[in-house]
């Protein structure tokens, strides 16, 4: 027997070196060995759900929580109906909801999946901003460490306050991270013990002490990233506030809504675990509250059924195969030329659409430029084998590397 827990989790996808999905490898191994495999999840991946719908997989459901605890209620807080004060991200309604729970001795979690203090730093006098010298991305300001950090290559820099125009820089910190939300929470609840729960704070030696304090309700308010959704049991946590649901539901990733569904169901599962009434609040500026209502509904099948219809209509995975081809190199012009030549080479020889080439959303990563091609075709080994044979024959320019990602999960 093979058991794959949290089968939907993106961490099963190895996206460096040899690229593969460990869940799919486990399914293949079970098939080769003719042994059963159990895929366990609160919200299945869209591929698994489609296999359930067409009867390829059988399904067993647990329709009750442990000890018959009720599922948390979900409420949407529409920020279009309120005016936030300058440089704040929590509405008065949100603060009032949190205060109601704190009065009942409930723990409160403010959730924002963004590390650090601010994702973008700009001087409003000289207009200089801090970007990573190795990647085409902003450096994130970590206030506690007084450090600017690239979350992709690890580059670190200090905040230079000397202005190229005159005197000292007058910084604008654009957008919040968990450190900034923590400061705002402390201003609103000065007498409460507040703790940040992220990979920056929980990988230290004292993390077990922090966990014990949370369990014993010595920490009343948590400000956390996605790390907090990973299977922790906090008996007093009965209020979760998602600071910005728009951050995860929008963007260039076709799986953004699916990933949000999985994340927020996992996150909601942290609340109300001991039977007390619990609520998850979602702050949003989006006027399309239908999609948010589906994502936050306790029945994930509502969203998954609609998502499958959209994917089928538009011939998107799991109804077609995507194969991502990422070309990387230090010479931008040579890379662009190779990408166009390679596309022409492929188009003449395979029975599939080749989209691109386009610059990757993160165009430069670890000092190398990145260009993407995307192959859309039938789900067949014949297509994969023919692409593999063509790649083996093709001669790229010196310094150009090709990475092949079958069934990509991320499109960065």
Regions found by a protein language model. Give the residues of each.
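Inter-lobe coupling/hinge segments of SF2-like helicase ATPases
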Residues: 1-336, 344, 371-374, 381, ...
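A structural preference for short, hydrophobic beta-strand core positions in alpha/beta folds
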Residues: 39, 194-197, 354-357, 404-406
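Short amphipathic beta-strand starts and helix->beta connectors
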Residues: 303-313, 348-361
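A common structural junction motif
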Residues: 343-352, 390-400
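Nucleotide-binding motor/catalytic cores of P-loop/tubulin-like NTPases across gene-expression machines
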Residues: 351, 366-369
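Short proline/glycine- and acidic-rich turn/helix-capping motifs at secondary-structure junctions
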Residues: 356-366, 402-412
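Short, charged interaction patches at domain edges and termini
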Residues: 374-386, 409-411
């Amino acid at each position: 027997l093979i058991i794959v827990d949290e089968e939907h989790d993106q961490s099963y996808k190895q996206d460096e070196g040899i690229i593969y999905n460990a869940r799919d490898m486990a399914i293949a191994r079970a098939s080769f060995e003719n042994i059963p495999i159990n895929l366990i999840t609160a919200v299945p991946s869209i591929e698994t759900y489609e296999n359930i719908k067409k009867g390829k997989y059988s399904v067993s459901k647990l329709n009750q929580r442990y000890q018959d605890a009720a599922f948390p209620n979900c409420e949407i807080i529409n920020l279009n109906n309120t005016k936030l004060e300058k440089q704040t991200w929590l509405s008065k309604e949100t603060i009032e909801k949190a205060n109601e729970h704190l009065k009942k001795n409930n723990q409160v979690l403010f959730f924002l999946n963004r590390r650090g203090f601010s994702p973008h730093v700009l001087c409003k006098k000289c207009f200089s901003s801090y970007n990573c010298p190795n990647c085409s991305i902003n450096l994130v300001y970590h206030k506690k460490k007084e450090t600017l950090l690239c979350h992709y290559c690890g580059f670190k820099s200090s905040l230079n306050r000397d202005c190229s125009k005159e005197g000292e820089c007058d910084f604008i910190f654009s957008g919040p991270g968990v450190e900034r939300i923590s400061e705002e929470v402390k201003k609103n609840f000065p007498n409460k013990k507040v703790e940040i729960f992220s990979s920056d704070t929980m990988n230290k030696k004292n993390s077990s002490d922090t966990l014990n304090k949370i369990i014993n309700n010595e920490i009343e308010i948590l400000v956390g990233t996605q790390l907090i959704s990973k299977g922790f049991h906090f008996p007093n946590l009965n209020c979760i506030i998602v600071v910005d649901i728009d951050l995860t539901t929008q963007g260039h990733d076709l799986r953004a809504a699916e990933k949000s569904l999985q994340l927020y169901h996992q996150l909601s599962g942290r609340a109300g675990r001991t039977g007390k009434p619990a609520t998850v609040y979602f702050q949003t500026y989006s006027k399309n509250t239908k999609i948010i209502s589906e994502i936050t509904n306790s029945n994930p099948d509502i969203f998954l059924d609609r998502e499958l219809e959209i994917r089928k209509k538009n011939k998107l995975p799991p109804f077609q195969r995507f194969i991502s081809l990422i070309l990387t190199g230090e010479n931008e012009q040579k890379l662009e030329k190779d990408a166009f030549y390679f596309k022409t080479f492929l188009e003449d020889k395979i029975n599939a659409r080749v989209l691109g080439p386009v610059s990757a959303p993160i165009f430069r990563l670890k000092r190398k430029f990145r260009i993407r091609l995307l192959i859309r075709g039938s789900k067949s080994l014949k297509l994969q084998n023919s692409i593999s044979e063509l790649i083996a024959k093709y001669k790229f320019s010196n310094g150009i590397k090709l990475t092949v990602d079958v069934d990509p999960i991320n499109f960065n």
